[in-house]
C-alpha cells in the first residue's frame, strides 16, 4: 500500500463513489478505501436478514416474508429526476452501462389532508382535483408561462427579470392560492423550505421546467427514475468504473487514520500499519469527526407491506411529499415506496420509507402523519441518525468532507453537494452537457 496517490477517498457512500468516479475519469490516481466489508456506508442496501439484524438484533427474518435475497432495501432511498443533474453526472462518467433504470410510477403530494397526484403541466392542472375551477385556470396560466419561459427570449418574460423578481412576486402576478403555492414549491420545484419565496424566481422556474421535461421524457406518471435492484447498485458500478481507469478499491480496511504534515495539510492515510501517501482526502463525516459539526437529526420509518400505498393509483413505485405547512411543521415529510417492479422486494411485497427532520425528542410521533398514509403494514422499523456538515477550510488542509444525507427522497440536495465538492477539489465546474438518451435503457419495458 506504500504508494502515492493524488486523492484518497474514504467511505463508499453514494457521494464518495460519484466523486471517486469523476476524479478517475479526469485521469487522477485514486485510492478508495472503506472500513466496512460492504459497499455504500450510510447509503448501503440491505437484504432482509441484514435488515433484521440491524433493527431487531436477530440473525434471520421470519420465513413468511419471503427469501432474504429478494430484498434490496436502500438505507438512503432517493429517486432521480430523469433529466436531472445526477443522471447527467452518471452519463458523464459512462457508469450507466453498468446500471438499468426504470421509470417511477407516481409523484404525489399531501394537501388538505389528501394524497393527490402532482400536476406539473397546463393539461394536468386542468384535470387536478387539487384545485377549484378558477384556480385551475390560474395555475394553468402559470404553468404555461413556466413552460414557455426562455431566458434568451425576452418575449417569453412578460416584462419580468426573473433574476430579480422574487418567486412570491411572480406567483402573485398569477393570483395563486396558498395550497397551490405550497405544492408547486415543495412537490414540483422540490424546495425543502419556504426561503425560495423571497429569492429570485429564476431558480424555481428552472426547477419547475426540469420537473416537466423529466415527466415528458418517459410518458409515465412521474419525472423520476430508479435503478433496478435499488441504489446499492451505484457504488458497485462506480467501483467497476474506477478499476477501468486504474483506480484501486479496498474494503474492510479498519481504522483509516488521516495523516497530516507540520502545516496541517493531508499527507496520507494509515491503515493496518501501512501508510498510503496522498495530496487530498475525500471522505464522509465519520472519517474526520473533529472537522464536522452536527446540524440536526433525521427520523425515518421503514415499512414492509403487502399492498401499494392507498390513493396512489396502485403505483408500484411512488413518492409522496407532505409539505411542512400542511402538517404545521418546520420541515417537509417524505414518503418513498418501491417494490418488485424495481427488484427491491419479492412479488407482492412493498418497501416504504417515511422520513423527515426530527424537530422534537419524540421523532416516532412526528412520523405518524406519513405512516398513516401507508395503510396496514406487515413490519415497521424506526431509525434516527445525526446529520453533520464540514467546518474545515479545504484550501488549508486539503480535506474534502461530504455533508450527511438529508431526509429528502429525491437527489436534488445530494448532487448539489457532490458538484460543489468537485469544484473545490479540482477548481473547475463539471460539464453536464451530455446526451440524456444514454440513461434510458429500461424505460421502454
Curated annotation (Swiss-Prot):
Pfam families: GDI. One of its GO terms (biological process) is small GTPase-mediated signal transduction. Keywords: GTPase activation. Regulates the GDP/GTP exchange reaction of most RAB proteins by inhibiting the dissociation of GDP from them, and the subsequent binding of GTP. GO terms for cellular component: cytosol. The gene is GDI1. It comes from Arabidopsis thaliana (Mouse-ear cress). GO terms for molecular function: GTPase activator activity; Rab GDP-dissociation inhibitor activity. Belongs to the Rab GDI family. This is Guanosine nucleotide diphosphate dissociation inhibitor 1. PANTHER family: RAB GDP DISSOCIATION INHIBITOR (PTHR11787:SF8), RAB GDP-DISSOCIATION INHIBITOR (PTHR11787). Interacts with the GDP-bound form of RABA5C (via C-terminus). Expressed in roots, rosette leaves, stems, floral buds and siliques.
Amino acid at each position: 500500500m506504500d504508494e502515492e496517490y493524488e486523492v484518497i477517498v474514504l467511505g463508499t457512500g453514494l457521494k464518495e463513489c460519484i466523486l471517486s468516479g469523476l476524479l478517475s475519469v479526469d485521469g487522477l490516481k485514486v485510492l478508495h478505501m472503506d472500513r466496512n466489508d460492504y459497499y455504500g456506508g450510510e447509503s448501503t442496501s440491505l437484504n432482509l436478514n441484514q435488515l433484521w439484524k440491524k433493527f431487531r438484533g436477530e440473525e434471520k427474518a421470519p420465513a413468511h416474508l419471503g427469501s432474504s435475497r429478494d430484498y434490496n432495501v436502500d438505507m438512503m432511498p432517493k429517486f432521480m429526476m430523469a433529466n436531472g443533474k445526477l443522471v447527467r453526472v452518471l452519463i458523464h462518467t459512462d457508469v450507466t452501462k453498468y446500471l438499468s433504470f426504470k421509470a417511477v410510477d407516481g409523484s404525489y403530494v399531501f394537501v388538505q389532508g389528501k394524497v393527490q397526484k402532482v400536476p406539473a403541466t397546463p393539461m394536468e392542472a386542468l384535470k387536478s382535483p387539487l384545485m377549484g375551477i378558477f384556480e385551475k385556470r390560474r395555475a394553468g396560466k402559470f404553468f404555461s408561462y413556466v413552460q414557455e419561459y426562455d431566458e434568451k427570449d425576452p418575449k417569453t418574460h412578460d416584462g419580468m427579470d426573473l433574476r430579480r423578481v422574487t418567486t412570491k412576486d411572480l406567483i402573485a402576478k398569477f393570483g395563486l392560492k396558498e395550497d397551490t403555492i405550497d405544492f408547486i414549491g415543495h412537490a414540483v420545484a422540490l424546495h425543502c423550505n419556504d426561503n425560495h419565496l423571497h429569492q429570485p424566481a429564476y431558480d424555481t422556474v428552472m426547477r419547475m421546467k426540469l420537473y416537466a421535461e423529466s415527466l415528458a421524457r418517459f410518458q409515465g406518471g412521474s419525472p423520476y427514475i430508479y435503478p433496478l435492484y435499488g441504489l446499492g447498485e451505484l457504488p458497485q458500478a462506480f467501483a467497476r468504473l474506477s478499476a477501468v481507469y486504474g483506480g484501486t478499491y479496498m474494503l474492510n480496511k479498519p481504522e483509516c487514520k488521516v495523516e497530516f504534515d507540520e502545516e496541517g495539510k493531508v499527507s496520507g492515510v494509515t491503515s493496518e500499519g501501512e501508510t498510503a501517501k496522498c495530496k487530498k482526502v475525500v471522505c464522509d463525516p465519520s472519517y474526520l469527526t473533529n472537522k464536522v459539526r452536527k446540524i440536526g437529526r433525521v427520523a425515518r420509518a421503514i415499512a414492509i407491506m403487502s399492498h401499494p400505498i392507498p390513493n396512489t393509483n396502485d403505483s408500484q413505485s411512488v413518492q409522496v411529499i407532505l409539505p411542512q405547512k400542511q402538517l404545521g411543521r418546520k420541515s417537509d415529510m417524505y414518503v418513498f415506496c418501491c417494490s418488485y417492479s424495481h427488484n427491491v422486494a419479492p412479488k407482492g411485497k412493498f418497501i416504504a420509507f417515511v422520513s423527515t427532520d426530527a424537530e422534537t425528542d419524540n421523532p416516532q410521533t412526528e412520523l405518524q402523519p406519513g405512516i398513516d398514509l401507508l395503510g396496514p403494514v406487515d413490519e415497521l422499523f424506526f431509525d434516527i441518525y445525526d446529520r453533520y456538515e464540514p467546518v474545515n477550510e479545504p484550501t488549508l488542509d486539503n480535506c474534502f468532507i461530504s455533508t450527511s444525507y438529508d431526509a429528502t427522497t429525491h437527489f436534488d440536495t445530494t448532487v448539489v453537494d457532490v458538484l460543489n465538492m468537485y469544484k473545490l477539489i479540482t477548481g473547475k465546474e463539471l460539464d453536464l452537457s451530455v446526451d440524456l438518451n444514454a440513461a434510458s435503457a429500461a424505460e421502454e419495458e
